């Protein structure tokens, strides 16, 4: 910028030749010039009629060594001495690698004339838009996308675009060049192992990657809903001081248009700073009748939950609605949020109003009125005060008020109010602004005012534009014409002149509005007075967002517009501009029920394009130069009028206003017990009369009271008085599945063709409109296709791009597909192998008569169900007219992968039938386990001869589930510290680093710290340019916000506590000092008085004579303390505070005389203790304090406390280890022991979880500080330039990566299914990190539930149905949780996470009593009432006893039926140490209702059939035996001896020795060793097999069980087993015939085989 300043000074010193004297030459160019784009400029001569040839040239800045473009134009009187040449600046000739802003010099020369202007460059050479086929995807699915590209003239542009896909963490995982003209763009396939969240598809031009365009989409596991729920509040806001209740209407419609019958569960709540605070009492059960229902939030319910309602103003009400169909078959959860809690229903803004006015001339005040949710408020009367004017808002929320301004004023104060007749005066919205008078040049008093009175402007309109002038007569007489420019989309679109007749003060012209002016334009005009003065004005004009061209999608005929049948043939017709390229996609509307925010639309396209407008205001300007600057233009004249130099292509953004902080007080009971006069004692009594969920005696409850003896006495008296009273209820509902015992005439199931094609999107086609256009210039094309099988409404979306009219998004065309009778098979997203699950087939009857339906579940060997290979499962139901019925099927998936479930149904006496076949995803059992290996690639220090080679060993996969896949992802990234820093700046990623929510004085410091350290690091290393200089502003604002908020908790003596009314905390005050001292290096306006006041308080109030610091009030949030809590507390606290004093020393030394002596006393105390410390953590912390004080240079004690000289660890304290090791690193850096620091840094970086976050706050903060200080202290890195080669087994070609500065933060990733050794080599300069993530499924062992440091017991029992229960509850259970801490002292700050049973909700009243009474058992609780998935309750405990069980008990209530309830879980864990945790499961009916299956290891076979055998018939003879043994599917016939019977799980294993192979089969050598026959335990009695007996046995090939190298045999109903008498028994007359038959059977089959 210094070079530019010097250049501008030099330019101003250039003299103008005499021949131009007396004329005014004006040169205008866009304020920002785009590369590779034709840009129009203007040169005008006023007062000179001599023809001239003008040379226009563009040069590099500042040296002007290159001519980037040149042209020559003629200026002559015939053209009005005005020319508008175009210039183009080629990007290829510029230094695009420069991190600094780039400029060019645009020069106009002619004999006797030279004008030039330095103009900012932009590499934005066009617009790119990405359309994805959907806005939401599941793992493993393809993301189809197409690219639309056009230049700034809205002309189609088919140059290459780079498309990148980025994970929610910002990691680029794919980057490919794409030709927008191609219709065969390969989709991006999401991996199965994928990050959930919002992904980005980013497009950028290949030759200008600085400008990018983004499409967003979500990735998560989901199932499409069967219907749509809309929630419509009665108002878009809630009056906080109103008296009326708040109503919401609920509408539920199937996606094919029919109305839903069912029930809705509605829960209201308030969202405060992003955190949801539910109102448990508002949970209501609402009937949905004919698709509609209404819920109400009663005013008194809200006020009971939040006592101080005014604290809610500015926050949002939300309502969560769960709708369940009458059949219980389907459920949809939706939430309506953004219902603002307000004191006035409207908000007024002046966003489209100029800030400047012309005294004595009309001032157009554009008032914009919105509802609290930001939507436009139509038909609202508004009125301005001081200068009276009134109007009414239009549909877009705007109203234009014309104010006639007085003469001779410099500012104009304006107040506008709404004037709604139904609102009292105090509820009318009001907004004030001050407009400033336009400053005339040299105080001439000459003005120009452009007036455009029309508001809703659209293409095809003729817009009147008025030019008003005011000034002295001599000046006005010189005006012969107005020169005007029309700017749109950042370009000068048109230049013209409007003549003015003598004496005309008002001149009007008509401007035709063409599609080129969409979405908005600026109209700027000026006139000249003499040869020096320019008088200018401008106005911004909005144009209705429509297509520049035409695109319509409709049915090709009237038949195509009707309701269609699945699979039917139909046609659509496309109508649009000739030559248009049209992209089509059909999307199931159910997708938009889940997510519609990312759908491409015409408005979104224009919103993006409008950002290319380089103008920054709604019009006008501070003075004549300001008019040009604010319109986005650069001006230079021959009389040295020059606009200011622009240095940013973007307009300056207003600072975000800081939201009002609101501390919401939770409700507490204030009812009174009349017999106790004292209010506090009334509370104790009332709490004593509450029912205790745990069933504790009054005497035990009294032990929890901390309020004193008087309270205990009152509590005990009232508790004993009310003892034994319960108030519960229960209401039973049972789901009854009707069955029919008769068979009738049904359409044959074998003739039913099942529907099986259910895509979420399809019709992904690109069509060209090349047909001859009709008389209206429209081309059309008919597209035939066959519909897919879904019963739904398809939304066909068409997007076109034409050669000259840009992009057009057509109105979606809907195709509704349904049948009068059909099946909807509802499947979960996935199920776990070998775990039972219920699926439902919902049968819909949309005819006017009741029907009888036979339903069949088809057999699939991949599932165990009531349908078997030999027996169909059928059931018959009656469905009433215009209703539905759910038929549940219980299955057990036996094989991993995608498997078909098929259900068919036919209507008795009719040809109506339907079948559905869907794929169900079966995932492996066990628990997903991740193994992360991190390897630092640093060839300069770790390599030999400049190359680092490393063997990466295969992981030990402990307890891997057999026959399951392994996923290994290998990713390589540059400099990891930079990655951590970058993620810390990003607000979304910052939230992942911080566990505790912000709010109180402690939480606020947790939130503020990472930004301070990150900003300090980036400032020191000068890396802001690589991350985006604008992000520093974000970080500084974050720090300032944290600083300002922390001052709320500062006491008068400069100490701090979580809340002002709590005792001051030494640790927190020191922490504030530490963080604020660091913040002064990046935010200079932090007051030294604030920091030094805290230091002085610590010295005077908390330091003892021996130098030690004391803590009288520990912090609430113990996780802040990190490792400082625990053993050796005095040393830890003193060292921590000494570090804070040392880091603030440079700020406070001259303000606090006793600071040095305080530091010396504390350091002396630590020196005496240092060599005797036991904990590695305390040793590291103390070492850093002493090294920072300059008293420690010997690292022997520190290194002796380490493990392997690279870490300081303690048992089961992972996060403390990171923190302690980081303190050790800081100590080594202070001692300048860099060689010792290197392995420490490597260990620290290796501990980072995959994705880049540490586990706990202090560990992250200190770890981050250590790594940042290491980067600062170590010598600067060489330029990053690494070549990495990975050699994977079974891949012939090695994988090669090049990492340099351009892609350092891009994760370059490869995947493999193998877990084998591989090698990696790195050469070059710089560092990189290779992360190997191996994911597999580990078996859940019986000891997997072993708990660490906690004992936990969970039980559940049913409550008597005669007792009272919650309204709408079908069943009530009591959940009891008992836990004990297994450490030496009580555990503090413990969390219990309860995962609810599906369909159940916790009783909020019970939980409130546990948290609100004087006998308080829990600190607080949070409820997540998502019944669609498992809800959860989070319970916070201040402590858990180490000497006795702490028990909690509360009710949970079933609100809807679930066919098969999966177990819930309870997890208890320490907030300070996540390794200390325990999990237990609970279930109301454990061990009941399970299908029978036989398992060996993790392989299971279905056994859901009777225990009858094939040979259990009345009469059997030799011929029947031969006939049955020789049936085609019989695999073997043996004579075998039963050796023993083994029991395993629910199966019996009969171990048999094959004595004779009568008919050989699959088992090639069955006599080699005993064979196992497996049967259900329940069949033991029916089989009645005896050890040491011989048997004739045969079975089917389908009953063989292949397990690796051996075969087992299943005993099923198809198995033939007969006892074969021994030799002695065969002599008896009773068995002689049987023995002869067996011998003859054996001889016949052995010698002759089976007959043909």
Swiss-Prot record:
InterPro entries attached to this UniProt entry: A-macroglobulin_rcpt-bd (IPR009048), A-macroglobulin_rcpt-bd_sf (IPR036595), A2M/Complement_sys (IPR050473), A2M_N_BRD (IPR011625), Alpha-macroglob_thiol-ester_cl (IPR047565), Alpha-macroglobulin_TED (IPR011626), Anaphylatoxin/fibulin (IPR000020), Anaphylatoxin_comp_syst (IPR018081)
Protein name according to UniProt:
Venom factor
Binding residues for Mg(2+)? 519, 542-543, 545
Note down the stretches annotated as region Factor B binding site: 743-754
**KW Acetylation (keyword) present:** no
Which purpose does this protein serve, as stated in its record? Answer: Complement-activating protein in venom. It is a structural and functional analog of complement component C3b, the activated form of C3. It binds factor B (CFB), which is subsequently cleaved by factor D (CFD) to form the bimolecular complex VF/Bb. VF/Bb is a C3/C5 convertase that cleaves both complement components C3 and C5. Structurally, it resembles the C3b degradation product C3c, which is not able to form a C3/C5 convertase. Unlike C3b/Bb, VF/Bb is a stable complex and completely resistant to the actions of complement regulatory factors H (CFH) and I (CFI).
PANTHER family linked to this entry = COMPLEMENT C3, MACROGLOBULIN / COMPLEMENT
The UniProt annotation puts the region (C3a-like domain) at 661-739
Q: Does the keyword Transmembrane apply?
A: no
Q: Which UniProt keywords apply?
A: Cleavage on pair of basic residues, Complement system impairing toxin, Disulfide bond, Magnesium, Metal-binding, Secreted, Signal, Thioester bond, Toxin
Which residues are assigned to the propeptide feature?
657-740, 992-1270
**SMART domains given in the database record:** A2M, A2M_N_2, A2M_recep, ANATO, C345C, Thiol-ester_cl
Biological source species: Crotalus adamanteus (Eastern diamondback rattlesnake)
In this entry, which stretches build a coiled coil?
Answer: none
**In which family does this protein belong, per the annotation?**
Belongs to the venom complement C3 homolog family.
PTM comment text:
First processed by the removal of 4 Arg residues by furin-type protease, forming two chains, alpha and gamma/beta precursor, linked by a disulfide bond. Probably, a cobrin-like protease cleaves the C3a-like domain and then the C3d-like domain, generating the mature venom factor (VF).
The record's Gene Ontology cellular component field reads: extracellular space
GO BP annotations of the record are: complement activation; inflammatory response
Q: Where on this protein does the Isoglutamyl cysteine thioester (Cys-Gln) crosslink form?
A: 1000-1003
């Amino acid at each position: 910028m210094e070079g530019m300043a010097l250049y501008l000074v030099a330019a101003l010193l250039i003299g103008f030749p005499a021949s131009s004297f007396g004329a005014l030459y004006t040169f205008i160019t866009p304020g920002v010039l785009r590369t590779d784009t034709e840009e129009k400029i203007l040169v005008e001569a006023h007062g000179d009629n001599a023809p001239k040839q003008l040379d226009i040239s563009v040069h590099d800045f500042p040296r002007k060594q290159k001519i980037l473009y040149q042209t020559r134009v003629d200026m002559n009187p015939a053209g009005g001495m005005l020319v508008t040449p175009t210039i183009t600046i080629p990007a290829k000739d510029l230094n695009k690698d420069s991190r600094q802003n780039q400029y060019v010099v645009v020069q106009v020369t002619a004999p006797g004339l030279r004008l030039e202007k330095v103009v900012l460059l932009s590499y934005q050479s066009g617009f790119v838009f990405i359309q994805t086929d959907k806005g939401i995807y599941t793992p493993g699915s393809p993301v189809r996308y197409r690219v639309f590209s056009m230049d700034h003239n809205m002309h189609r542009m088919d140059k290459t675009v780079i498309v990148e896909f980025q994970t929610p963490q910002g990691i680029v995982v794919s980057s490919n060049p794409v030709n927008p003209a191609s219709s065969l763009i390969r989709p991006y396939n999401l991996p199965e192992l994928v990050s959930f969240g919002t992904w980005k598809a980013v497009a950028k031009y290949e030759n200008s990657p600085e400008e990018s365009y983004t499409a967003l989409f979500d990735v998560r596991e989901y199932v499409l809903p069967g219907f749509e729920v809309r929630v419509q509040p009665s108002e878009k806001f809630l009056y906080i001081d109103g008296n009326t209740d708040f109503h919401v209407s609920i509408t539920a419609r199937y996606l094919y248009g029919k109305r839903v019958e069912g029930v809705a569960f509605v829960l209201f709540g308030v969202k405060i700073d992003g955190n949801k605070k539910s109102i448990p009492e508002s949970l209501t059960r609402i009937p949905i009748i004919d698709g509609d229902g209404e819920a109400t939030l009663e005013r008194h319910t809200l006020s009971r939950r939040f006592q101080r309602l005014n604290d809610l103003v500015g926050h949002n009400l939300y309502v969560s609605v769960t709708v369940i169909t009458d059949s219980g078959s389907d459920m949809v959860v939706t939430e309506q949020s953004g219902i603002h809690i307000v004191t006035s229903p409207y908000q007024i803004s002046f966003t489209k109003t100029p800030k400047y006015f012309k005294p004595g001339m009309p001032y157009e005040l554009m008032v914009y009125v919105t509802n609290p949710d930001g939507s436009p408020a139509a038909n609202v009367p508004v009125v301005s005060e001081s200068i009276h004017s009134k109007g009414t808002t239009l549909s877009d929320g705007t109203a234009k008020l014309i104010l006639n301004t007085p003469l001779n004023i410099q500012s104009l104060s304006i107040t506008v109010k709404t004037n709604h007749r139904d609102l009292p005066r105090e509820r009318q919205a009001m907004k004030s602004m001050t407009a400033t008078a336009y400053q005339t040049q040299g105080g001439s008093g000459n003005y120009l005012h452009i007036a455009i009175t029309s508001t809703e402007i659209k293409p095809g309109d003729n817009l009147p534009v008025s030019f008003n002038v005011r000034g002295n007569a001599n000046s006005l007489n010189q005006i012969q014409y107005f020169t005007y420019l029309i700017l749109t989309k950042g370009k000068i679109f048109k230049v013209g002149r409007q003549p003015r007749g003598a004496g005309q003060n008002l001149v009007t012209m008509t401007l035709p509005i063409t599609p080129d002016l969409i979405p908005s334009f600026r109209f700027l005009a000026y006139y000249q007075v003499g040869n020096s003065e320019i008088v200018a004005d401008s106005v911004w004009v909005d144009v209705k967002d429509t297509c520049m061209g035409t695109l319509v999608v409709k049915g090709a005929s009237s038949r195509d517009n009707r309701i269609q049948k699945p699979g039917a043939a139909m046609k659509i017709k496309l109508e649009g501009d000739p030559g248009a390229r049209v992209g089509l996609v059909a999307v199931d509307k159910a997708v938009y029920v889940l997510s519609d925010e990312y759908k491409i639309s015409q408005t979104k396209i224009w919103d993006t394009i409008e950002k290319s407008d380089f103008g920054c205001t709604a019009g006008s300007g501070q003075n004549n130069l300001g008019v040009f600057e604010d319109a986005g233009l650069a001006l230079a004249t021959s009389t040295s009028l020059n606009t200011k130099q622009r240095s940013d292509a973007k307009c300056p953004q207003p600072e975000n206003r800081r939201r009002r902080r609101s501390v919401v007080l939770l409700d507490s009971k204030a009812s009174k017990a009349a017999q106790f006069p004292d209010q506090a004692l009334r509370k104790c009594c009332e709490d004593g009369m509450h029912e205790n969920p745990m069933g504790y005696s009054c005497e035990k409850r009294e032990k929890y009271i901390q309020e004193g003896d008087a309270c205990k006495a009152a509590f005990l008296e009232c508790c004993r008085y009310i003892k034994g009273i319960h108030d519960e209820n229960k209401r039973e509902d049972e789901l009854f599945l009707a069955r029919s015992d008769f068979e009738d005439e049904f359409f044959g199931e074998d003739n039913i063709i099942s529907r099986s094609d259910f895509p979420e999107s399809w019709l992904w086609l690109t069509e060209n409109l090349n047909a001859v256009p009709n008389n209206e210039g429209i081309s059309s094309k008919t597209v035939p296709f066959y519909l897919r099988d879904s019963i739904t409404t398809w939304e066909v979306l068409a997007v076109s791009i034409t050669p000259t009219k840009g992009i057009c998004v057509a109105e979606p065309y809907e195709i509704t597909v349904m049948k009068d009778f059909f099946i909807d098979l509802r499947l979960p997203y996935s199920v776990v192998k070998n775990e039972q699950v219920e699926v439902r087939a919902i049968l819909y009857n949309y005819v006017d008569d009741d029907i009888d339906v036979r339903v069949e579940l088809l057999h699939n060997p991949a599932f165990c169900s009531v349908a078997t290979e030999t027996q169909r499962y059928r059931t018959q139901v009656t469905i009433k007219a215009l209703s539905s019925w759910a038929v549940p099927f219980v299955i057990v998936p036996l094989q991993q992968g995608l498997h078909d479930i098929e259900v068919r149904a036919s209507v008795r006496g009719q040809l109506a039938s339907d079948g559905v076949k869907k794929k169900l995803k079966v995932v492996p059992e066990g628990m997903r386990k991740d193994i992360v290996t991190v390897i630092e690639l640093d060839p300069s220090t770790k390599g030999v001869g400049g190359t680092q080679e490393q063997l990466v060993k295969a992981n030990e996969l402990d307890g891997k589930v057999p026959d399951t896949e392994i996923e290994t992802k290998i990713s390589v990234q540059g400099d990891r510290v930079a990655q951590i820093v970058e993620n810390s700046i990003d607000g979304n990623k910052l939230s992942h680093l911080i566990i505790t929510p912000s709010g109180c004085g402690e939480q606020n410091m947790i939130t503020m710290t990472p930004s301070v350290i990150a900003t300090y690091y980036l400032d020191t290393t000068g890396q802001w340019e690589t991350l985006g200089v604008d992000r520093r502003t974000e970080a500084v604002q974050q720090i300032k916000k944290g600083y300002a908020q922390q001052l709320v908790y500062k006491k008068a003596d400069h100490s701090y506590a979580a809340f002002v009314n709590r005792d001051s905390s030494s640790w927190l005050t020191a922490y504030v000092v530490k963080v604020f001292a660091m913040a002064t290096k990046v935010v200079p306006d932090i007051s030294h008085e604030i920091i030094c006041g805290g230091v002085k308080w610590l010295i005077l109030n908390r330091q003892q004579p021996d130098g030690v610091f004391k803590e009288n009030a520990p912090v609430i949030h113990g996780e802040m303390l990190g490792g400082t809590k625990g053993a050796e507390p005095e040393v830890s606290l003193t060292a921590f505070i000494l570090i804070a004093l040392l880091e603030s020393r440079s700020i406070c030394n001259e303000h606090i005389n006793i600071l040095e002596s305080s530091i010396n006393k504390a350091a002396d105390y630590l020196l005496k203790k240092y060599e005797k410390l036991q904990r590695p953590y305390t040793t590291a912390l103390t070492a850093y304090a002493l090294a920072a004080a300059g008293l420690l240079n010997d690292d022997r004690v520190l290194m002796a406390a380490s493990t392997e000289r690279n870490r300081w660890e303690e048992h089961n304290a992972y996060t403390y280890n990171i923190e302690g090791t980081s303190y050790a690193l800081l100590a080594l850096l202070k001692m300048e022991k860099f060689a010792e620091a290197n392995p420490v840094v490597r260990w620290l970086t290796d501990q980072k979880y995959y994705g880049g976050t540490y586990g706990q706050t202090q560990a992250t903060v200190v770890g981050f500080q250590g790594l940042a200080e290491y980067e600062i202290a170590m010598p600067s890195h060489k330029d990053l330039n690494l070549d990495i080669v990975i050699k994977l087994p079974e891949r012939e070609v090695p994988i090669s990566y090049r990492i340099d500065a351009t892609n350092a933060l891009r994760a370059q990733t490869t995947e493999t299914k193998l877990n084998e050794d591989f090698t990696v080599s790195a050469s070059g300069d710089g560092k990189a990190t290779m992360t190997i993530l191996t994911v597999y499924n580990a078996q859940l062992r019986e000891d997997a539930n072993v708990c660490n440091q906690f004992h936990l017991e969970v039980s559940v029992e049913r409550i008597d149905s005669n007792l009272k229960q919650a309204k709408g509850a079908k069943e009530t259970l009591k959940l009891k949780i008992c836990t004990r801490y297994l450490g030496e002292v009580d555990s503090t700050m413990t969390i219990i996470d309860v995962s609810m049973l599906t369909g159940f909700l916790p009783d909020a009243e019970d939980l409130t009593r546990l948290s609100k009474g004087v006998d308080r058992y829990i600190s607080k609780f949070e409820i997540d009432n998502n019944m669609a998935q498992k809800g959860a309750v989070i319970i916070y405990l201040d402590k858990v006893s180490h000497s006795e069980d702490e028990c909690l008990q509360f009710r949970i209530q079933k609100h809807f039926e679930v066919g098969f309830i999966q177990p819930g879980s309870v997890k208890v864990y320490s907030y300070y140490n996540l390794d200390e945790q325990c999990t237990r499961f609970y279930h109301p009916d454990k061990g009941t209702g399970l299908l029978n299956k036989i398992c060996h290891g993790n392989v299971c076979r279905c056994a859901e059939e009777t225990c009858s055998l094939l040979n259990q018939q009345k009469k059997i003879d030799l011929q029947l035996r031969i006939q049955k043994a020789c049936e085609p599917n019989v695999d073997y016939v043996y004579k075998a001896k039963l050796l023993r019977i083994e029991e395993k799980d629910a199966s019996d294993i009969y171990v048999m020795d094959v004595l004779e192979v009568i008919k050989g089969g699959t088992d090639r050598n069955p006599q080699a060793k005993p064979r196992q026959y497996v049967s259900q335990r329940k069949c033991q009695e029916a089989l009645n097999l005896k050890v040491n007996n011989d048997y004739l046995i045969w079975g089917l090939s389908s009953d063989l069980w292949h397990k690796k190298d051996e075969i087992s045999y299943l005993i099923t109903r198809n198995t033939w087993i007969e006892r074969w008498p021994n030799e002695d028994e065969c002599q008896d007359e009773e068995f002689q015939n049987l023995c002869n038959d067996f011998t003859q059977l054996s001889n016949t089959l052995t010698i002759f085989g089976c007959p043909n």
